[in-house]
């Protein structure tokens, strides 16, 4: 009979899936569910040892002999008793997995018996420490990732998995349970082997590469060639050949869902992509990351390739250009059609008389295409960068998407402009601009910095957050409603200033911004209608 606890069953299955078959078991009530299910599974060679200090060293000896071992202890100071063995394993680089049962989080520091702050207790002497606390939403995928992170790190030394559990009396017993057997494979190839390429182009029927925010130093023809053979969803923050896809993803038909996602880079601006792309139950997710981080916004990860984005994409490019058996799939053709429809939809949504943030960005990008000088374009977070993902084509976009805060966007562009002779443009919303106005308080700034300020006198993105329309205090306390303009800021800092309050003034202002010669920065402030 097994205890029916998802965390326990997931841990039991993954220990076996990662090749750990020798487990030292120490007595206790809090860890009884883990001990019972490990023994009951008959997948492990089990060693009962009462003294945790001795048990830790016995686990070390087993690891020295067979390669890997685990030890399971109960809650409280039992965990600290294994510390001497863990320290020794750390400096020997031996693979020892320490599993500690723990009281629920609400019992810690509440004078409940046999409790202490267990999570992090061994941090100085383990390669990875995880805590299987309960979170809102999908606990299983969250716990799966944490356990896999720890067990992958175990290849380089000891790790600690802390498992908060209820009283054993609160968990029922059943005859059979599902033991998780889906590890995350860590692959560190020097080249893209033939079998990997075959799996990408022939094993999967609907392969898709998703590229988040990152710096990829590859020529544009690499991306454009790859797009002929494989569907790529990317944003201009990482790929100058990116195609707009937000409207496609929001109404995505099942035939456009991938069965293999290859995820590269950091966060994506498009919010809906994560849940929608992973909607198909058979979707696998591979991660390409030189640091081998188990990171996936798709709530699933099956394999990690320890390659840089440049190395992986360049080797994929070499594969499609050298092999004659790789041809565009129907999936690629379906997505190409969807891209064309989305581009037309975005174009049709812009009116010549319209003065909106979208029309400003669209006109700016259209005129920028005609410029013959070198340039770099920064977009501030929030509405500005979301518009960039719709209307930018043919150049890279810079944006602080590491944490996605609005602070420092203008200062980042200013710093960029100070270190180059090229033109640097920054498109920003009003809250980002006024929050970071001291970026312009700098006598060393040159005339190569040009700013487009989209001023609708509040955080416009809050108008589109579902649920906030019911908030009676949205305008006053949430969206930062104000009546400020940038004229005074520009005057006091010797910055050129252009005001635009109509569509015609906006278009003339953008032409001036792109062509006027000056030795100081210029700000074009476009006053937009407020909702």
Each model region followed by its residue ranges:
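Cofactor-/ligand-binding subdomain signature composed of acidic, glycine-rich
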Residues: 1-18, 143-201
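Active-site diphosphate/adenylate-binding microenvironment
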Residues: 8-11, 16-19, 26-30, 34-39, ...
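Structural signature of the thiamine diphosphate
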Residues: 22, 66-74, 79-81, 89-96, ...
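Phosphate/pyrophosphate-binding active-site segments
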Residues: 1-2, 278-381, 485-489, 495, ...
